[in-house]
Design a protein with these regions (language model features):
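Walker A (P-loop) ATP-phosphate-binding motif of ABC ATPase nucleotide-binding domains
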Residues: 2
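Hydrophobic anchor at the beta1->P-loop junction of P-loop NTPases
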Residues: 5
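The conserved Walker
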Residues: 9
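Conserved lysine of the Walker
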Residues: 13
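Hydrophobic positions on the alpha1 helix immediately C-terminal to the Walker A/P-loop
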Residues: 16, 20
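N-terminal phosphate/diphosphate-binding loop that engages ATP/GTP or pyrophosphate donors
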Residues: 21-72, 76
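Phosphate-binding/switch loop-helix module in NTP-utilizing enzymes
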Residues: 69-120
């Protein structure tokens, strides 16, 4: 099963993915993959890191000072996706019960290897929970095992409960 979480910027996609990760780990499931938290400097968003959930390794994904392909005001470090994110996701495919990818968006998709790896995950049998940029969602092929949830501040708790119920049915967790 693939659970894709989308919504407007600031709607709580990453928070939702984090809550679901905590829930699964609390149930004894192993979780791997990546998160891409923002980096703030002086109260302003300066960039984004990519963090390997299993090892804790981190690298700078994008910043206002990074050279590389641009997404808005951020330069993207494609190399960190290829060298840190892709191996983390591939390792999680082999070793973990669930893969987390936060997020599948324009910055991350600048890496051809990342795009290939996401396609592999989508074609695999492993459980995936991913935050997906709204515009990216259309490019992800529709599959029977993909469930899309739209998060907004008013419905966050209801959406979370619907996903927990779905996970319980899927994995017999209840």
């Amino acid at each position: 099963m693939k659970i894709l979480i989308t919504g407007r910027p600031g709607s709580g996609k990453s928070t939702m993915v984090g809550r679901l990760r905590d829930y699964l780990e609390g149930m004894g499931f192993s979780v791997g993959g990546i998160i891409t938290p923002e980096v703030r400097v002086g109260g302003s968003r300066w960039g984004f890191e990519v963090v390997d959930i299993a090892s804790g390794r981190r690298g700078l994904l994008a910043s206002v000072e990074t050279e590389g392909p641009r997404i808005g005001r951020y330069g993207v470090n494609v190399g960190v996706m290829d060298e840190l994110a892709v191996p983390a996701i591939r390792r999680a495919m082999l070793e973990d019960d669930c893969i987390i990818i936060d997020e599948i968006g324009p910055m991350e998709l600048k890496s051809r290897e990342f795009r290939r790896t996401v396609d592999e995950v989508l074609s695999s049998d492993v459980l995936l929970i991913a935050a997906v940029h709204r515009k990216t969602l259309q490019s992800i092929k529709k599959r029977e095992d993909i469930r899309v949830f739209v998060v907004d501040p008013e419905k966050r708790d209801r959406v979370y409960q619907r996903i927990i119920d779905l996970l319980g049915d899927y994995h017999g967790m209840r």
